[in-house]
Amino acid sequence: MLKFQTVRGGLRLLGVRRSSTAPVASPNVRRLEYKPIKKVMVANRGEIAIRVFRACTELGIRTVAVYSEQDTGQMHRQKADEAYLIGRGLAPVQAYLHIPDIIKVAKENGVDAVHPGYGFLSERADFAQACQDAGVRFIGPSPEVVRKMGDKVEARAIAIAAGVPVVPGTNSPINSLHEAHEFSNTYGFPIIFKAAYGGGGRGMRVVHSYEELEENYTRAYSEALAAFGNGALFVEKFIEKPRHIEVQILGDQYGNILHLYERDCSIQRRHQKVVEIAPATHLDPQLRSRLTSDSVKLAKQVGYENAGTVEFLVDKHGKHYFIEVNSRLQVEHTVTEEITDVDLVHAQIHVSEGRSLPDLGLRQENIRINGCAIQCRVTTEDPARSFQPDTGRIEVFRSGEGMGIRLDNASAFQGAVISPHYDSLLVKVIAHGKDHPTAATKMSRALAEFRVRGVKTNIPFLQNVLNNQQFLAGIVDTQFIDENPELFQLRPAQNRAQKLLHYLGHVMVNGPTTPIPVKVSPSPVDPIVPVVPIGPPPAGFRDILLREGPEGFARAVRNHQGLLLMDTTFRDAHQSLLATRVRTHDLKKIAPYVAHNFNNLFSIENWGGATFDVAMRFLYECPWRRLQELRELIPNIPFQMLLRGANAVGYTNYPDNVVFKFCEVAKENGMDVFRIFDSLNYLPNMLLGMEAAGSAGGVVEAAISYTGDVADPSRTKYSLEYYMGLAEELVRAGTHILCIKDMAGLLKPAACTMLVSSLRDRFPDLPLHIHTHDTSGSGVAAMLACAQAGADVVDVAVDSMSGMTSQPSMGALVACTKGTPLDTEVPLERVFDYSEYWEGARGLYAAFDCTATMKSGNSDVYENEIPGGQYTNLHFQAHSMGLGSKFKEVKKAYVEANQMLGDLIKVTPSSKIVGDLAQFMVQNGLSRAEAEAQAEELSFPRSVVEFLQGYIGIPHGGFPEPFRSKVLKDLPRIEGRPGASLPPLNLKELEKDLIDRHGEEVTPEDVLSAAMYPDVFAQFKDFTATFGPLDSLNTRLFLQGPKIAEEFEVELERGKTLHIKALAVSDLNRAGQRQVFFELNGQLRSILVKDTQAMKEMHFHPKALKDVKGQIGAPMPGKVIDVKVAAGAKVVKGQPLCVLSAMKMETVVTSPMEGTIRKVHVTKDMTLEGDDLILEIE
């Protein structure tokens, strides 16, 4: 008996009680014996197999699965009551096409009926016949109908006989390329090749010209042969921009045929459906009537039974053309089920048992459209790379569910392996709503809930489709995707949690990602962050700057009573003591406290210099992001950066437009004071930097680099007159503030008094700023002398980050001036709390701390004049190479090298040049005299040669002769400012290159980072693409990773906190990987990490290097089915090189350039991973 329920104005079939009573048939139709089905085998895999199993279970029918050797881990074999292996030793697809094995399983296991699903053998008449011959029912049309409908040429003839309009095309499969030529001569282009024995987009190619004909014919034939076992093709006229409408039909064995209305499958890519809609929106009722009546008429013409689909193209004039009949269940049958409340699989089974449609309560007048349904096929394809299939292991799978959402899936679960052997479909998501916009909203919400990690998916693309106004309006055709390129403006998933786990796992397996100079673990104690009051910080000098501009700011500084301080803790202090390794994570922690308690600072030095490239190179963080985040936390204190004149923040010369743009963007991101210097005090370089900073609206602070001793009358090269003359030039050029940059700490109190008082007398209204290092130990005394001589600002570092090669102690300066006219008005007790935090933070960076090898400063700096940061580096390098006892020789060589080069101003990059020459002399056992005597024969460091060529400017007093001429010989020399001859850099072109290289949104900041440090930036972007931003990790985890069983929290952003526990690390597998297990927010996660040390001993196929022109990599994982070139062959751009097959789709890899094949790294039948090197072109 039947049970029905009234649903939204229609009747819903709830179920059929299985009995032995005969079905009701028309009086004029022969009554058939009712034969209940007790066991069904699905000759298919994946989600369609599971869909049928579920229907069978609901009907009390036992289920049988078949699976290939490659599918042993797939879910469909677990969802059945029984599962059997087929196609042993066969290729993955061939296993499911092997009829003898399938029939054997059916007969040996008492199977009553076989459901073919879709694809594979579902439209093979010989399979339907084989089932019938074996006494097993085929759940589908009769073999004869399958044959007729599967042969698209015969189906076309039947349609014509039935009076159904068809597209002009061949009457039978073509046997040669010549026939395709003849057809195109008759009907013109475009034309389309179609597989004669299957669908789903396989073996389908559109051709627009004679030039494309041969290649597309070959590819279509090959795809059809691979997918359906028969490469036969037919060709027809291609209807441009049609709607693709298909009508669901259902017939029984008594001649009853009905339709279940239509579906719009117009949203396609390469003739494969991506999104399906039921019913078709804005479809004229008369056209709907013609489509459905023609479908029923065609089905009756051929005596159709069971479920099927009649497909049509509808042109822009509303004229419809028959395409084909799919004599099987369609992938998109789900949307019809949702809007009609008819379970099509139930109906298929009941019809195969001998029931009639009226038995099932299915009459045309009872079929009503209820609402709208949309199906999205979520696939493991990368839309950003032309939908290339992705393979790999699903690390995370979380689906979107809720009211109005149906999911049909198979092996979509954490740990599932997506292979290249089969279709890329992961899950079908079906949304049902009262109308099209409602269904689209539900679908969009569901897709937004999905989390799939480990493989790429097309979800971002689907979300763009769902948000497209044309789609929401329901106006779509088969060119929808091609005509809406904005659909490919994909917003990349953040994937922050999984990327963090990948990073932590990588560190646990391979050790720190940043080089660790000393094997010392970070302190286990977190630094104590002092309490910060609630509310905005008090006003500071930045408020004056924003209100009155650079000139007003300079006046306020000059008119201020008392000594002003610049805090270098955020930059130069950790550059000098901790190898510039302090992370933004630790700077941000203390930043609010500084804003609230040190608002009367002149500025905070927190950017520029070495921090820029070290941030990317070793800390894997964006220096611009550091600036932005600190600006948000410290809105009231001016920020100051170190700008290397025409070198900006790099070590070489850049085109002028790069320097100007850099300053402009730095100002936009929150930089205030630009302290501009040149390593040689070369005025043209400094003037360029000043002009760039000034035009950006920044405070221009020209810095004169100090060396020598103005108080020593025997030191005549860098005399008081030299500095005063340089100051005159800089003031004339419009500097707002004048700075003396004493990078080696050479200013003695007497020299301070002489130099500063002279500058104050000469420039009474100009703010004076003094920067020094405390290597000699006299820094506090020197800064007090400067203040007493008229300096407005001196540099200090908080106590626990001061001294040695860093700046003088903040607390000492504050205490020494307290109660005097120079009182800094900085609360001393606040300095204590600030220092306590940095004492704890410094412990986190123990592996980089200079005190690992250097226990104190040294007054010999007055002799060797080594800058603070470089003194630390040279000291460490000597000890790390076992030359600690020879550091004295290094310092002596530094002095000699300096004199050989003409007694230079020594600050980056000139200090590095002197250091390189010194180390060269020590390593080669050369004295100054020997080096000078052998200058013509020796191969000096590149930095030395380029300096002598004039690459960084002209030193005071000129180049040393004859040493320069001996070294350079015939090498070219640069006259004047080095950057003046450089052509402007095309920043727009660079931006385009970066987008092509990294495949994501590129900011103006990224462009400038790449302009300054192209290689470092590229490595940084590649690193973060794999591991994501790491600023949320604490420094201990960043450097050494977690210990097993360690639990910790990571705050991604306000209100989003991850709870993580490290569980275990597995043994090495055959691929050179270790599996690392975590618990994330209570759920088990695991990732595979390559063991870099172990992989050095294993052989793997080489990868194509993206930055090496001519290295062609596999665009996707797959199998090589054809190699079209050999070594030595000449190729042109666009020429096919090889053909890959993956997920039953073929991809032709073409040459991106003209050249000669240097080497081919693949052979036919080789299986490749993504980016595996295919060949090299030169």
From Swiss-Prot:
Pathway: Carbohydrate biosynthesis; gluconeogenesis. It comes from the Eukaryota. One of its GO terms (biological process) is NADH metabolic process. One of its GO terms (molecular function) is pyruvate carboxylase activity. ATP binds at K152, E236, H271. Homotetramer. Interacts (via the biotin carboxylation domain) with SIRT4. This is Pyruvate carboxylase, mitochondrial. It comes from Rattus norvegicus. The lineage of its organism: Eukaryota, Metazoa, Chordata, Craniata, Vertebrata.
